[in-house]
């Protein structure tokens, strides 16, 4: 009894969280995050880029040597005279591993009172002298700098420009508009696309996307900040409708000439994963049909744009989703690494261009097939996923990568020897590790966390796996009353597949009480909610709700990432069906627990999770008492072509699948309290989803609640994010507790 009272007294003496403490955008959020170390590679050397200076870190003993201070950097830049003051060293760069150079961006005053500019400035921190500066418009976007030539590509008002190191600016295009876009991301950032320009290794040529979207309808977004509200266009190709047409150009600054890759008619095709050959002469591109069930790796002559041939083909009865460009071996330009899920899990394959062959066709996973036009050797294999490639060890001729080979919830750092596929683990084999590698691959910076480790950063020698700890952060929540967070597994609705969950129990949990329970759900592809990192990846809002007496349950259903192709594509052509079956297995598990109040179950999610929340409320109206659906998809025919058709096919080809996932048709099933929340200017799940659902509910005589954030897009940021979670919390307080 004395011991129990002591524990209760300790708990009562600890602090309680506010939403500002727990949410990005909260006024005290950063004060309660684990201590961090901000770093950058300077060639082979690791540098701490701190608030007030930069320090080189000794890999042998972890000691630090000052390279320069913030005040010195501002002095060298002439801050306050020709440019703005740099307020921290967090974002400085070291553009040349062979030179003592530091680079940063400062604001310029513009020439002759012209428009404001930005200046990319390089300083020699040994001599304190400026090496060079590169000025460009302050409103430029899509910045892409070549580390070889130091030329800069950028986009302004949908046109593409190149500025050389010497300051000469050239317009690559002049007819850019909302209908015709140059140098920007295409295909709505699907297929791993993160940018629209691609420098050759020597920096003397620039490949770029040109996207004609004149045939794509404008979705009307509303700007309420004008005296009388106005609309502005948002190009949005919906499933089954016309999509944009993409072509690829190659610009040579020395001649001012552009050639176009002769890829043929771009109608209903996707071009992605653009890669250059090491000799700057060839361009490789992966091309997909609109059905996304066939991909070809194609080679082009960069000088003429001529198509030289297909290197590799891959097809699958559901879909193929290439996400990564080619990685040529630094020691052998005839070989490259290719990533593919052709055998059921994302793995690495070694392609040898020096060994062309008559096309070799092989059967692959789930009735798929591939055709190899050069020799291909699997480099990794197994029922696990390569999550990220980090770089190469040049001396040992190995590749470094992260995978979940040890456990589906983990991420660990390995190196694999290219000549024979021998793998070596480079970390402690626990938790979640992410890394970055120096120039020659001799060291990896290992950033690690686990359910009990807030953050640990080490510098590891890749030759022997020995690491030097640089930081082990204390738990920033040690003075707070933190709920118990556990992790476990249940079986999926198929009866065989393991699904992993996180449970956050109420603060001061009493197993003899019954608690209101909220299921937080996402459930879609390219995301997961549970992993073996700090607090099993628990979100701040879950901690806040546990503090208010709720039990939180989070389950990664089939359809989510990092579990292999079969785990993901089981949802094909009927999104929401298998996902809900798995979530209901979670409900069945919860109902078996004596401390879960089955009469007070709620559900909340955002985006795909908003779709899942609404679907669960309407499909199982007697199970869920309250729900909050954020930015939901309501009808997949209103969603974008690329994502929607990959998982659902076109509405014309899959009418039953689209009908089954159309939540408007279930509007009459609503019994519990459902609040729908959207950003009024959402360009991802456009407002038509939620507004059409409200109309369907009116027609059906049901009563959902609705709230919108004018001016916000798909996600609320800053103080709006705190406001959002205050509203979500209050809804459950009003209707679930």
Each PLM stretch: what is its role?
Residues 427-428, 549:
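Structural signature of Gram-negative outer-membrane beta-barrels, strongest in the C-terminal barrel
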Residues 2, 11-424, 430-434, 442-443, ...:
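Beta-propeller folds
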Residues 6-8:
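N-terminal signal peptide c-region/cleavage motif recognized by signal peptidases
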Residues 217-218, 280, 286, 434-737:
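Serine-hydrolase catalytic core recognition
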Residues 2-4, 146, 494, 683:
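Generic alpha-helix initiation/capping and coil-helix boundary signal
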């Amino acid at each position: 009894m004395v011991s129990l009272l002591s524990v209760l007294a300790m708990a009562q003496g600890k602090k309680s969280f506010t939403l500002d403490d727990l949410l990005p955008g909260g006024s005290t959020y950063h004060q309660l995050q684990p201590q961090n170390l901000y770093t950058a590679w300077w060639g082979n050397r690791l540098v701490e880029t701190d608030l007030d200076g930069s320090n080189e870190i000794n890999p042998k003993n972890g000691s630090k040597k000052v390279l320069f201070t913030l005040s010195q950097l501002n002095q060298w830049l002439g801050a306050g005279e020709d440019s703005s003051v740099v307020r921290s060293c967090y974002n400085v760069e070291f553009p040349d591993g062979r030179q003592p150079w530091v680079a940063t961006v400062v604001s310029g005053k513009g020439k002759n009172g012209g428009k404001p500019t930005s200046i990319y400035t390089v300083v020699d921190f040994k001599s304190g002298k400026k090496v060079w500066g590169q000025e460009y418009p302050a409103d430029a976007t899509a910045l892409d700098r070549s580390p070889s030539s130091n030329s800069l590509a950028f986009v302004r008002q949908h046109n593409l420009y190149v500025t050389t190191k010497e300051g000469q600016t050239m317009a690559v295009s002049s007819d850019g508009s909302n209908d015709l876009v140059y140098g920007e991301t295409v295909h709505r950032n699907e297929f791993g696309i993160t940018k629209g320009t691609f420098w050759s290794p020597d920096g003397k040529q620039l490949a770029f996307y040109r996207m004609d979207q004149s045939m794509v309808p404008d979705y009307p977004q509303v700007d309420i900040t004008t005296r009388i509200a106005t609309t502005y266009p948002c190009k949005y190709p919906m499933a089954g409708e016309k999509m944009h047409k993409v072509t690829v150009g190659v610009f040579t600054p020395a001649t001012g000439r552009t050639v176009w890759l002769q890829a043929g008619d771009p109608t209903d095709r996707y071009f992605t994963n653009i890669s250059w050959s090491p000799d700057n002469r060839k361009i490789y591109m992966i091309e997909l049909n609109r059905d996304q069930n066939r991909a070809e790796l194609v080679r082009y002559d960069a000088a003429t744009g001529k198509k030289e041939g297909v290197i590799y083909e891959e097809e699958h009865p559901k879909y193929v989703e290439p996400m990564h460009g080619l990685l040529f071996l630094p020691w052998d330009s005839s070989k490259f690494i290719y990533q593919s899920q052709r055998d059921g899990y994302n793995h690495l394959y070694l392609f040898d261009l020096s060994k062309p062959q008559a096309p070799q066709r092989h059967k692959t996973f789930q009735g798929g097939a591939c055709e190899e036009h050069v020799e291909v050797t699997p480099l990794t294999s197994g029922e696990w996923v390569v999550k990220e490639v980090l770089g190469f060890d040049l001396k040992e001729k190995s590749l470094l990568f992260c995978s979940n080979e040890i456990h589906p919830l983990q991420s660990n750092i390995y190196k694999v020897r290219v000549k024979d596929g021998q793998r070596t683990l480079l970390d402690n084999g626990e938790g979640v590790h992410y890394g970055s590698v120096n120039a020659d691959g001799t060291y990896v910076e290992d950033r690690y966390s686990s359910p009990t480790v807030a953050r640990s950063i080490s510098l590891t020698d890749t030759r022997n796996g020995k690491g030097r700890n640089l930081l082990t952060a204390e738990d920033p929540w040690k003075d707070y009353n933190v709920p118990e967070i556990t992790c476990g597994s249940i079986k999926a609705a198929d009866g065989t597949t393991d699904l992993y969950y996180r449970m956050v129990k109420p603060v001061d949990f009493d197993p003899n009480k019954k608690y209101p329970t909220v299921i937080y759900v996402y459930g879609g592809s390219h995301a997961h909610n549970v992993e073996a990192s700090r607090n099993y990846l628990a979100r701040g809002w879950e901690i806040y709700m546990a503090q208010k007496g709720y039990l939180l349950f989070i389950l990664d259903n089939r359809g989510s990432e990092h579990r292999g192709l079969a785990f993901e594509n089981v949802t094909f052509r009927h999104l929401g069906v298998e996902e809900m079956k798995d979530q209901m297995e979670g409900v069945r598990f919860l109902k078996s627990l004596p401390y879960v109040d089955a009469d007070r179950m709620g559900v909340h999610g955002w985006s795909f999770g908003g779709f899942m929340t609404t679907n669960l409320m309407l499909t199982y109206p007697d199970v869920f008492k309250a729900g909050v659906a954020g930015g939901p998809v309501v009808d997949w025919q209103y969603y974008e072509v690329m994502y929607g058709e990959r998982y659902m096919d076109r509405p014309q080809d899959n009418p039953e699948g689209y009908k089954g996932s159309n939540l408007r048709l279930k509007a009459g099933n609503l019994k519990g309290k459902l609040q729908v929340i959207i950003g009024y200017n959402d360009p991802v799940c456009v407002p038509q989803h939620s507004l059409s659902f409200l109309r369907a509910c009116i027609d059906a005589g049901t009563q959902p609640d609705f709230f919108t954030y004018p001016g916000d897009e798909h996600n609320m940021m800053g103080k709006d994010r705190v406001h959002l979670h205050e509203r979500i919390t209050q809804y459950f307080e009003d209707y679930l507790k």
